[in-house]
Amino acid sequence: MRFEHAQVCGFEGALRGMRNPLASWKRTDSLYGLEKYDDMPEFHVAASWVEATNPDLDKNDYKYEVLQDKYAEWLRNNGILKFDEEKNDYVEYAFIGPKDMDLAERLMNAGTEHRKFLRQIQVSVDITAPLYWWKEFDTYKVGTTANSTSTMHKLASTPITLDCFEIDDYIELDEDFKYEIDKLIEFLEYLRQKYNETKDKRYWKELIRWLPESWLQTRTVTMNYENLRSICHQRANHKLTQWHQFVQWVDCYVPYSAQFVFGKPVALD
């Protein structure tokens, strides 16, 4: 299973919109933009975090600088949305301040009708996964869109090998087991070659018929943070290992997933 070309957008509009009900836009303390890496304002936002969490701490205190460095690192780890080396190291960022995060957390805790802003933060990613996992992912129709590679048009265009299937946790139980799998792949490759030689659609139909559900398919998926929140909460303990990989990807690579997806408070070690 692979996750590639991930992009996240919509933080600025979503967090501005969450302040619409009380017209509290002047209280926003987040910064968004496109800057060279060395010019990013993460330390400015980090200072806001230090002052919000330690209001009695003097700016000249050594601890202030230590905390500011920690918050700046946390902001870089979460707030860098896109880094493009081909464009002179420009970085797209969304550094969320403590006031905006506090409001966001209160809205998320209040329920789905209040956390509408999560549905305005969009994620796009190319996922390569077996067909049996995609069947379960298709349960999530509302708010998600997927554009897949075509099994119908492209299945016969490349050789069929073991690498075409999900083998992340593949176990060779014994020689007989491995032999049967190898024979199945040889059979599928035979059908593919016969179709290419004869253009007889009956071979193509048999290839489709006997293709295992472990066949890897790539889809470009768009979804929002509310989708991620639902999926990760519902599938965290699923017996399919691919769901654990999905949850792990969200946890490790999706910006601010700890707070916006898993509901954890901002806590620095």
Summary of predicted features, one role per range:
Residues M1-D269:
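Family-specific signature for flavin-dependent thymidylate synthase
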